[in-house]
Amino acid sequence: MQIAYHTYSSYQSLFHKNRRKNDNLEQQAQALFKSWFVDFEPFKDGKLVDSELGMIPEGWRVGNLLDIAKLYDAKRKPLSSRERENMKKIYPYYGATSIMDYVDKYIFDGTYLLMGEDGSVMDDKGYPYLQYVFGKFWSNNHAHVMQGKNNFSTEMLHCLLLKKNISPIVTGAVQAKISQANMRKILITQPPHEITIIFSSHIKPIYEIRKKNELENQRLSILRDTLLPKLMSGKLKINDINN
């Protein structure tokens, strides 16, 4: 029992350490995004013009979220807990706000952004629940699945939505919902393509480190959930893990 506890404690310590690292990386990316696309610091020497979203650099335009995001919602498919219970724990199974389980097959393969569609869709500040995901995974139908398009990288899309107040487009008195139609009501500023390409190159290294930390946490979660019950029951000895 003591060995199992120390094993669990070790996994949790590494898990939370990686979480803190990723929180810091997210803050770095968000600060850079704010500097470029909220405060317009690199463009202050140029002319600003009025728009629906206030003053923006000349040559930029106002669009909506689906001008820069491609949706893959039609590919989603929920799996019941009964369907998942006998599956090997290999690929993440995502819900509206987090990994719900691991399964032995996948629908998506690549880098995507998930945004809660119904149930839990925003925090108390009105910001959307987002999950930056990558690799092979499965998603149920409670999260919109999207990627950046038109020279907006998925990483840039993530930065844009992190601090975007979406409360005006959320519907549902009993259960909150963000429909695809209402996603078009999320207005965004679109800079020229060359600017989005340069910015994406600046934040890509930050997200690569984030991916590395997240992969380690997924591995730790699987080890925790599969090995610890065996350690607790005595079916597995600590020497078996070390070997």
What are these regions (language model features)?
Residues 47-48, 56-57, 61-191, 239-243:
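DNA target-recognition domains and sequence-specific DNA-contacting regions of bacterial/archaeal
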